[in-house]
Amino acid sequence: MTTSENDAAWPDHKPTALLVLADGTVLEGFGLGAEGHAVGEVCFNTAMTGYQEILTDPSYAGQIITFTFPHIGNVGTNEDDIETVNMAATPGARGVILRTAISDPSNYRATRHLDAWLKARGIIGLSGIDTRALTALIRSKGMPNAVIAHAKSGEFDLHGLKEEAREWPGLEGMDLVPMVTSAQRFTWDETPWIWDKGFGRQDAPEFNVVAVDYGIKRNILRLLAGVGCKVTVVPATTSAEDILAMKPDGVFLSNGPGDPAETGKYAVPVIQKIIESGTPTFGICLGHQMLGLAVGAKTKKMHQGHHGANHPVKDETTGKVEITSMNHGFAVDQATLPKGTTQTHISLFDGSNCGIALEGKPVFSVQYHPEASPGPRDSHYLFQRFADLMRQKKSA
């Protein structure tokens, strides 16, 4: 598909897409991707690369992503950069907002134009609006609820869209994990991509790990396999008894979307039993938040969230700073961390909690995404830390 064949090229006719905010504000632009409309929470992501990984991250369920970097789509799409494990699930992101038109892809790995890929995935897109102004609005007023709509005719039921945006309850109180979790148990042995070789296979695993899928990303599974794990991925509603019956050397609590307090209604009792069993446990993102809930802390909704691949985090135990990839709109309230739980990492942007460890137990978690994809690799060591804990437990 050439640029001139899609609405994203900003044709010389009336706008074909709208972003309707809950306060009644209407932003006009040009449509791309699927036609139709979707409601969600508008956030902004500051990453300059990795748009396909971001758009396929299940943690974005219920959200409309605004990219602050203006040139999105210029390297096309491919099959290797998809992060969703459950391809049958509803796409995570409800919509995407871009500043400029999508150019023809120019990359040796590209197999498809981003516009065609969005259509195939059922994701609605909008280009041609002032994304800097929208980002400034989010920074000052918080993440708004909104409807994104695309119609090639340029005709919209504006009253109905405004009403839908206004009445949508927002992400607080929503359990979105059922939309993205795997329906059945499966095993994973694919290891990280290597230049000129592609993805590898773990054919001599040292550890048996059960990964609870709240919306897990492929690169997390690859890095687990890369440190010697045979990974069994289980649905989010799997009981502690079923997990422990698999005799895991470790349990991984994955990333995912929605309000952790709502998902925690069924997940927290499971996590508490896993902690009591003494099994080494590692959590990321939503898994981190629910681990916090499991030890008695509380979570809270953030004003604008953290979404990007350049977030500095300080390791409070070493004083070192890591540049990390983040994607979350909720956080563990550090003021509620109980005795016996150590805060290990904090954000250097706002001081919010980014990591915890349980004293005297092989249990830890981080709020950010050490697997990156996209993002820096500063935090890959955490997967090795998990492997070391399992090795120590096995040799005890």
Predicted regions and their residues:
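Active-site-proximal beta-strand elements of phosphoester/diester hydrolases
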Residues: 208-212, 324-325, 364-368
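Residue-level structural signal for beta-strand termini and adjacent loop
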Residues: 31-32, 70, 327, 358, ...
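Short solvent-exposed loop/turn micro-motifs enriched in small/polar/acidic residues
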Residues: 10-13, 306, 338-339, 348-349
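RNA-binding accessory domains that recognize and position tRNA/RNA substrates
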Residues: 2-246, 258, 373-378, 385-396
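Catalytic beta-strand/loop cores that center a nucleophilic Ser/Cys/Thr
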Residues: 319-361, 396
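Residue-level detector of beta-strand face positions
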Residues: 18-19, 57, 312-314, 355
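Proline-centered loop/turn at the N-terminus of a beta-strand
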Residues: 124, 208, 280-282, 298, ...
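Cysteine-nucleophile active-site neighborhood
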Residues: 245-331, 375-393
